[in-house]
UniProtKB/Swiss-Prot annotation:
Keywords: Organellar chromatophore, Plastid, Ribonucleoprotein, Ribosomal protein. Part of the 30S ribosomal subunit. Pfam families: Ribosomal_S15. It comes from Paulinella chromatophora. This is Small ribosomal subunit protein uS15c. GO terms for molecular function: structural constituent of ribosome.
Length: 89
């Protein structure tokens, strides 16, 4: 489920590290988290949508890899992002 342009822009503005940042690890994790939450709501309504469930698991794996990379860059950046997004680390 793609995100609309206004939602993407809000996420970028909140999580960017400088004025032209659109692809940093923080922004990517924030966008994946938003997509995961939307898809989780969809799957609660449609329990037998197995292709969407597989896509959800792929997104969760990608977010986990990005979070591991962010942790290797610095524990403080990792913990700030986890707290800001409200996800488990």
């Amino acid at each position: 489920m793609p995100l609309d342009t206004t939602t993407k822009q809000k996420l970028i503005n909140v999580h960017q590290t400088h004025s032209t940042d659109t692809g940093s690890v923080e922004v990517q994790v924030a966008m994946l988290t938003e997509r995961i939450s939307k898809l989780s709501g969809h799957l609660q309504q449609n329990k037998h949508d197995f292709s969407s469930r597989q896509g959800l698991l792929k997104m969760i794996g990608r977010r986990k890899r990005l979070l591991n990379y962010l942790r290797s860059l610095g524990e403080d950046r990792y913990s700030q992002l986890i707290n800001k997004l409200g996800i488990r680390g």
